[in-house]
Regions:
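Transmembrane-helix signature of 12-pass secondary carriers
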Residues: 1-185
Length: 185
């Protein structure tokens, strides 16, 4: 038995998938920015690299805290609005990291960012997969995962261009965290 030719995605399905892919990509972008500038932030705030590494752990620990309320909210009213609010939330929090005056404030902001990360994946993946035709969900869920690698690549390129080439501080990189909100809204 042959496999039927896959139908083109309708605009609603395509847009939902692109929104989820961009959300996941930009989530990874901001998440990996911290890793790329650990040493510089540690120097600026006078903390050890071990304490800096805790920022990553703290961010990940907060994911479940964001996943549950955003998921419940989405089950009540639909996926789009909670996803847009979530992306705006983590974008603004990521941007605020650029203005952190000390390690404690940066840690608090990364904890809040983790809440946004938790909401984004569940909402984006659910929205995309609900809109994708049943017979193509496996294919598109695989493509969706590429977004995280793409986010890391974009973070590395941003680091290279903004930090290494232009010579701007780590704070400028966090200024780029507003991109997800601008793209999604």
């Amino acid at each position: 038995m042959g496999t039927p030719v896959a139908a083109r995605l309708d605009p609603d399905s395509r847009n939902a998938f692109i929104a989820a892919l961009l959300g996941w990509t930009m989530d990874a972008f901001d998440y990996f920015l911290v890793v790329l500038v650990y040493a510089e932030i540690a120097k600026d705030f006078g903390v050890s690299l071990e304490r800096m590494a805790f920022l990553t752990t703290a961010t990940l620990l907060m994911r479940p805290v964001g996943a549950l309320p955003f998921g419940l909210w989405a089950d009540r009213i639909g996926r789009r609005t909670p996803l847009m609010v979530d992306v705006a939330f983590y974008s603004v929090v990521g941007f605020a990291c650029a203005f952190a005056p000390n390690f404690a404030v940066l840690l608090l902001l990364r904890l809040l960012y983790g809440i946004g990360m938790g909401g984004e994946w569940g909402l984006g993946a659910a929205l995309a997969m609900e809109k994708i035709p049943t017979g193509r969900r496996g294919q598109f869920s695989g493509i969706l995962q590429v977004g995280y690698s793409l986010g890391y690549l974009l973070a590395a390129l941003a680091f290279l261009l903004v930090h290494s080439v232009a010579g701007l501080s780590w704070r400028w990189l966090f200024g780029l965290s507003l991109l997800p909100a601008l793209v999604s809204l």
